[in-house]
């Protein structure tokens, strides 16, 4: 398929949840990606953080093929060695006690929101459940994470939203401090905001 065929087919059958750049990727190696028209471009997004080893990485492919030759999926109903070993390694390297593997950033943030509120409820009672987020943040497309996202244009069409979220301007310590009352159980923030540019919060924030 050439680019127009790919684009027209995708536009016809895929839900328009994302804006696409006018390019179709067909292959690549490391940070170099090949387009359907033969162009070679550099991937500065790392596949939005997914392809951190680059595209078509030899070590990743070898590990993937070795595992797929054994069993491709077991669900969470059963134990399996690769998951146990990965969890152990992550805990040892990060200093945390437990890890949870998720399918997306939105799912991870949903779990973090639930975990923060559950911990706060158990420790402080039911009236300490507010989560502070930053204006212009982006935390996901589920109902909880789109509420945590501090951008009005994401809030237009999906009312009513989940309660218990407040927003502060990134870098404004005074505005942030004023939100820290006795109802706050957690803060969710991006140290570097990626929506609308690369916005770095000050070190002393």
PLM regions with names:
Residues 87-189:
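PLP-dependent aspartate aminotransferase-fold enzymes
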């Amino acid at each position: 398929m050439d680019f127009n065929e790919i684009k027209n087919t995708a536009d016809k059958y895929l839900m328009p949840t994302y804006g696409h750049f006018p390019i179709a990727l067909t292959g690549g190696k490391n940070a170099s990606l090949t387009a359907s028209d033969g162009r070679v471009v550099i991937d500065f997004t790392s596949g939005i953080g997914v392809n951190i080893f680059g595209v078509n990485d030899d070590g990743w492919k070898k590990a993937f093929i070795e595992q797929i030759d054994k069993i491709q999926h077991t669900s969470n109903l059963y134990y399996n060695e690769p998951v146990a070993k990965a969890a152990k390694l992550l805990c040892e390297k990060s200093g945390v006690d437990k890890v949870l593997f998720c399918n997306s950033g939105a799912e991870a943030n949903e779990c973090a929101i639930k975990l923060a509120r559950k911990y706060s409820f158990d420790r402080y009672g039911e009236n300490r459940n507010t989560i502070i987020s930053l204006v212009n943040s982006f935390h996901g497309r589920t109902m909880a994470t789109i509420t945590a996202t501090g951008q009005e244009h994401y809030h237009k069409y999906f009312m009513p939203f989940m309660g218990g979220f407040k927003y502060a301007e990134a870098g404004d310590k005074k505005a942030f401090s004023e939100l820290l009352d006795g109802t706050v159980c957690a803060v969710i923030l991006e140290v570097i905001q990626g929506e609308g540019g690369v916005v770095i919060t000050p070190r002393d924030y």
